[in-house]
């Protein structure tokens, strides 16, 4: 190929000739290093000896941190950044690059590897532009990440993709009216012509968004460009929202890992397809390939000539828009519509990972604006005791981390106890002895004083669950009538009708064992019930009660919860054993879930140094499947739970045969209160588990529970951590509305995190149903890579050291139900008890002395 002008450029000791043709865009790069701008004597980063021109990116000093972030340097649109822009953007950081000034690599950033080793390279493609009336969301750019072995001084070429341009605000008054929603000129012209996108009726052309540019990371090998990573750009949105958007799932991200695969460009029509690795642009609207300069395609000429639309593709091969959206750039460019109709979005490009790399994470569409590249050292910590280490820039090595109270030995592997210099032993003994004697004297005086007041203080004790249980057993308190509260113990109680199909339990058949804690209405007890149909043996249950003094609203809420709980019959929803609503005290009897709530169980099961977790990845997947089964049942019965969270899920036991069940319907009950939808009443809204449409507009559908289930998955695989760590509810609201999503928990398998991200789609229609979630969880249980994943080691103190209550011997096996010969009705009668005051007429019997002391077995999920 002939050249009109030739430019000779040298990089160090390696030289090559770059052949450029100003009048043609069909010149391809064969063996050309990055063309540089002329060095400036005022720029300290550039030095130019008489015969050799060095790049402006010297090797990083030994003190440089092992993480580098590359951006668009503030550039946007079709063209890449300049050297001046990148110098300003990277000022004050460890990133030093050389930016191409001309030719096919104009806008490409050159960076040199500071030292040999393995590097984790993460690339983010740019998002596509929004359409004039399709602006609720944009097509996300794709994220890819892999590990590469790089040598000292090796040159990496980095092209950071730029976001495709939006159609609005438009370039003419008429187009601006369309953007504001005050004009339907495009739709009216389409209706009159009857063409809806057929070429020839171009008066209404334009209004689509440009395709997003791809992000490329490549190097030169044997005189040829070799791609390492290509993160595809998102396709541009069309003028109108697609008609079938609500009935189709989002297309999966595409990945290519064959070096010999062709890097072709996307097909297009009036809107251009995305540029590929080696393609040739067939039209001005098509995005240029990397070897053509990777410029974004122009907007179609008809759009500019009529309504002033000019939505170009982003730098990185994004296709220009017309009425349809442009295709996204990539290793292979995304296609654009050939008919240019009103609702044809551009397709995303195809990502690429070199086969010589170690795949770190499957591609995922996450980027909502410009692309970026992050490079960090990949540390090999397999030799460390905790399998964890950190990079020491001064020593240029990975230093192992040791537990608290220990230090690293000289061999950089062994952890040993900290050396504590011995103190003056005699003085220490004297101080301890004196302090002990003084403390004993003070305690003796206090004991003598307190003994005189002990009887009075016993009468003034604050109410507690155990005190309330004692009062129910012995008290005969009578209350005066108050019109604002229901009467307790005065006259006959109002009879409430029972729902059909629910077992009515007489209070005479209920025995209280011990208090579990406080609920939303009153106390919750562990107890025994006899006389159930078809079962003569006593059954352990959890008993919800209504307090002595209650308002009419409390009575209605209690009845509503009873109706909701008794409605469901499923193995993964806590079963309602029976109700007692015809006389006071009102009772709801639930099956006793001895394993406690899921959140506390997960926190207690975290692995610690010297204390492995009793759980494996299959156990976590089983917990998720159990709750998904319950949610699927609710979804099929058109019931919206509104508060799927780990704290509201209970375990039948803590052993291997555990079954997880949904155990709280408080949010579902509260929606029937008139005050529920008042703006600003955030106390009733669990913001961290709710999608944007729920806390912004008060819209609840089955897709609301899908979002909450994604957060529950995050809780399960983080072993009980609070979602959105370190953020307040208001910060979470702003973060989610702004498009932010949580990162995967440490050690979470990629397929499981993909289920979370699908549940967190901004558009409710794009979130999967629970039938689809169950299918994807089943795939995970059949994936050896997922099942063999290890739980991350916890470096902090164990729950016992933190003072939290553990599960004790409950973690070894399920609680066995009482045997009939141990708890026969005759023995229950022999236990006896004193009169129960207001409970006397109902015949409710407490369990007398069995040595049962108050224990913190209360689960907050038992509350409403």
From Swiss-Prot:
Start and end residues of each Protein kinase domain: 510-786
Effect of residue 862 to F: Impairs phosphorylation of CBLC (demonstrated with chimeric EGFR-LTK)
Chain intervals with Gly residues compositional bias: 263-277
InterPro entries on file: ALK/LTK-like_GRD, Kinase-like_dom_sf, Prot_kinase_dom, Protein_kinase_ATP_BS, RTK, Ser-Thr/Tyr_kinase_cat_dom, Tyr_kinase_AS, Tyr_kinase_cat_dom
Annotated positions binding ATP: 516-524, 544
EC number(s) given by UniProt: 2.7.10.1
Gene Ontology terms: cellular component: membrane; plasma membrane; receptor complex
Disulfide bridges in this chain: 73-86, 168-179, 300-322
Post-translational modification: Phosphorylated at tyrosine residues by autocatalysis, which activates kinase activity.
Pfam families: ALK_LTK_GRD, PK_Tyr_Ser-Thr
Topology relative to the membrane: Single-pass type I membrane protein
Reported disease: Genetic variations in LTK that cause up-regulation of the PI3K pathway may possibly contribute to susceptibility to abnormal proliferation of self-reactive B-cells and, therefore, to systemic lupus erythematosus (SLE). SLE is a chronic, inflammatory and often febrile multisystemic disorder of connective tissue, thought to represent a failure of the regulatory mechanisms of the autoimmune system.
UniProt-recorded name of the protein: Leukocyte tyrosine kinase receptor
Source organism of the structure: Homo sapiens
Gene (UniProt): LTK
């Amino acid at each position: 190929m002939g050249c009109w002008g030739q430019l000779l450029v040298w990089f160090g000791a390696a030289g090559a000739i770059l052949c450029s043709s100003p009048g043609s865009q069909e010149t391809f790069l064969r063996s050309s290093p990055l063309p540089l701008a002329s060095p400036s004597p005022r720029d300290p980063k550039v030095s130019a000896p008489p015969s050799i021109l060095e790049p402006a990116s010297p090797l990083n000093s030994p003190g440089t941190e092992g993480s580098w972030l590359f951006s668009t340097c503030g550039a946007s649109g079709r063209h890449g950044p300049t050297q001046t822009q990148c110098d300003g953007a990277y000022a004050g950081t460890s990133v030093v690059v050389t930016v191409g000034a001309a030719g096919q690599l104009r806008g490409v950033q050159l960076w040199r590897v500071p030292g040999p080793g393995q590097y984790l390279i993460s690339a983010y493609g740019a998002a596509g532009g929004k359409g004039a009336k399709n602006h609720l969301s944009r097509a996300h750019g794709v994220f890819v990440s892999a590990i590469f072995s790089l040598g000292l001084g090796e040159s990496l070429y980095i092209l950071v993709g730029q976001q495709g341009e939006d159609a609005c605000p438009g370039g003419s008054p008429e187009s601006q009216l369309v953007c504001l929603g005050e004009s339907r000129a495009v739709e009216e012209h389409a209706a009159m012509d009857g063409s809806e996108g057929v070429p020839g009726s171009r008066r209404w052309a334009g209004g689509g968004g440009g395709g997003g540019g791809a992000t490329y990371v490549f190097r030169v090998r044997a005189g040829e460009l070799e791609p390492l990573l290509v993160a595809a750009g998102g396709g541009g949105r069309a003028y109108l929202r697609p008609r079938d958007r609500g009935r189709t799932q989002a297309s999966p991200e595409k990945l290519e890992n064959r070096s010999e695969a062709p890097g072709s460009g996307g097909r297009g029509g009036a809107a251009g397809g995305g540029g590929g690795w080696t393609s040739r642009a067939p039209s001005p609207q098509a995005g240029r390939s990397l070897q053509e300069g990777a410029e974004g395609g122009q907007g179609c000429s008809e759009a500019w000539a009529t309504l002033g639309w000019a939505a170009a593709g982003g730098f990185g091969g994004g296709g220009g828009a017309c009425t349809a959206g442009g295709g996204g750039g990539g290793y292979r460019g995304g296609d654009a519509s050939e008919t240019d109709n009103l609702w044809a979005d551009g397709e995303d490009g195809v990502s690429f990972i070199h086969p010589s790399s170690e795949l770190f994470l499957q591609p995922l569409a996450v980027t909502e604006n410009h692309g970026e590249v992050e490079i960090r050292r990949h540390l090999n910590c397999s030799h460390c005791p905790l399998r964890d280490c950190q990079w020491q820039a001064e020593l240029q090595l990975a230093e192992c981390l040791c537990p608290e109270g220990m230090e690293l030995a000289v061999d950089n592997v062994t952890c040993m106890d900290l050396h504590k210099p011995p103190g003056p032993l005699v003085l220490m003994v004297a101080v301890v002895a004196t302090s002990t004697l003084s403390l004993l004297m003070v305690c003796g005086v206090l004991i003598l004083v307190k003994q005189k007041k002990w009887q009075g203080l016993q009468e003034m004790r604050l109410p507690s669950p155990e005190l309330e249980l004692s009062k129910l057993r012995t008290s005969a308190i009578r209350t005066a009538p108050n019109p604002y509260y229901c009467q307790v113990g005065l006259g006959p109680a109002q009879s409430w009708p029972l729902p059909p199909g629910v077992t009515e339990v007489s209070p005479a058949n209920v025995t209280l064992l011990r208090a579990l804690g406080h609920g939303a209405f009153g106390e919750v007890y562990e107890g025994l019930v006899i006389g159930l149909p078809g079962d003569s043996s006593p059954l352990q249950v959890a008993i919800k009660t209504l307090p002595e003094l209650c308002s009419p609203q409390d009575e209605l809420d209690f009845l509503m919860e009873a109706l909701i709980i008794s409605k469901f019959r499923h193995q993964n929803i806590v079963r309602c054993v029976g109700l007692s609503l015809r006389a006071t005290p009102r009772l709801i009897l639930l099956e006793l879930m001895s394993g406690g709530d899921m959140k506390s169980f997960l926190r207690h099961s975290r692995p610690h140094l010297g204390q492995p977790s009793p759980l494996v990845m299959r156990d976590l997947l089983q917990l998720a499947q159990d709750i998904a089964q319950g949610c699927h049942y609710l979804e099929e019965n058109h019931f919206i739970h509104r508060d799927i969270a780990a704290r509201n899920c209970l375990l039948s036991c803590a052993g291997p045969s555990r079954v997880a069940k949904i155990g709280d319907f408080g949010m579902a009950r509260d929606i029937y209160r008139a005050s529920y939808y008042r703006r600003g009443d955030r106390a009733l809204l669990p913001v961290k588990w709710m999608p944007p449409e729920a806390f912004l507009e008060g819209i609840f559908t089955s897709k609301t529970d899908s979002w909450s289930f994604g957060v529950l998955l995050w809780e399960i695989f983080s072993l009980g951590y609070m979602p959105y760590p370190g953020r307040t509810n208001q910060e979470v609201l702003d973060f989610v509305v702004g498009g932010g999503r949580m990162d995967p928990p440490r050690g979470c398998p990629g397929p499981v995190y993909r289920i979370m991200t699908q549940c967190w789609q901004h558009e409710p229609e794009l979130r999967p149903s629970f039938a689809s979630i169950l299918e994807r969880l089943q795939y995970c249980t059949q994936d050896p890579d997922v099942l063999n994943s290890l739980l991350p080691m916890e470096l902090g103190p164990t729950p016992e050291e933190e003072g939290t209550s553990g599960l004790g011997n409950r973690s070894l096996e399920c609680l066995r139900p009482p045997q009939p010969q141990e708890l026969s009705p005759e023995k229950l009668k022999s236990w006896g008890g004193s009169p129960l005051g207001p409970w006397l007429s109902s015949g409710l019997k407490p369990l007398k002395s069995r040595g049962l002391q108050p224990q913190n077995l209360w689960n907050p999920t038992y509350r409403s």
